Every structure is written in C-alpha cells, then in structure tokens.
C-alpha cells in the first residue's frame, strides 16, 4: 500500500521541538478503580477518547473501537500528530491509555480529564520523549 503524507504532517520534525524534544512526547496513563459499567461501555470509551482529540487540539484522521465479549473495549485513534490508544479491563477496574503526539503538543494535559471522565480513583502516568537514541 502506498501512503502519501499531507503537507501539514511535514511540520512534525525534530527541529520544531529542539534537541531535548525528540520527535514527540508519549504519555502512558494507568487508570485504576474505574467503575465496571464505564470501562465496559463502547460508547463512553469512544466518546471520551474522541474528546481527548478536542482537548489536545489535534487533527483526527481515523478511529476504530472494538467491544470484547464478555467485557472490555480497545480502540485506536490515528491523529495527524501520531496516535491515541486505549485498552480496558472492566473486571479489574483498569484502563491503559497511550497518547503519542509529535510537534509541540503536550499530551500530559489530558491526564486529569481522563481521570474525571472515566471516574478513576487512582491514576499514574509517565511521559517519555520519543526519537532516535535512548528512551528519555
């Protein structure tokens, strides 16, 4: 399959963020003690992750969400600036969310939003600088 990159996507480069920025930022978010009904609801998870796109002011390209039986939801949103993914384990009250953004977008701004929307009692996150070389 041949993929063409649109001109706006070409603005995402190492030089935009400086030498300590890499090509982007990737935040890993662990949400715990969330209600089963929230994490098992496809509509709630999809709506919440699409709201993250708005909060970050990034550009949606594609999204796909899947409801598992007997429980759980996974989804991925492809944004011009990279991606957002989610996997839920309602039986554990746990959701794993990754937000990877290129350019100057700061993905850490969505942590509290996700905690509130998914009714998490506990949240932890780790921000990684992505790019060539060692993980920082």
Predicted regions and their residues:
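Polybasic/polar functional segments that serve as interface/processing modules
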Residues: 1-136
């Amino acid at each position: 399959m041949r993929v063409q990159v649109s001109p706006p996507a070409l603005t995402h480069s190492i030089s935009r963020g400086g030498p300590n920025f890499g090509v982007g930022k990737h935040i890993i978010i662990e949400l715990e003690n969330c209600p089963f009904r929230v994490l098992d609801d496809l509509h709630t998870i999809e709506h919440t992750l699409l709201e993250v796109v708005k909060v970050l002011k990034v550009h949606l390209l594609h999204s796909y969400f899947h409801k598992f039986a007997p429980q759980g939801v996974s989804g991925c949103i492809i944004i011009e600036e990279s991606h957002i993914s989610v996997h839920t384990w309602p039986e554990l009250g746990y959701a794993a969310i990754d937000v990877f953004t290129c350019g100057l977008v700061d993905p850490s701004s969505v942590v509290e939003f996700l905690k509130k929307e998914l009714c998490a009692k506990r949240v932890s996150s780790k921000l990684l600088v992505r790019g060539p070389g060692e993980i920082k």
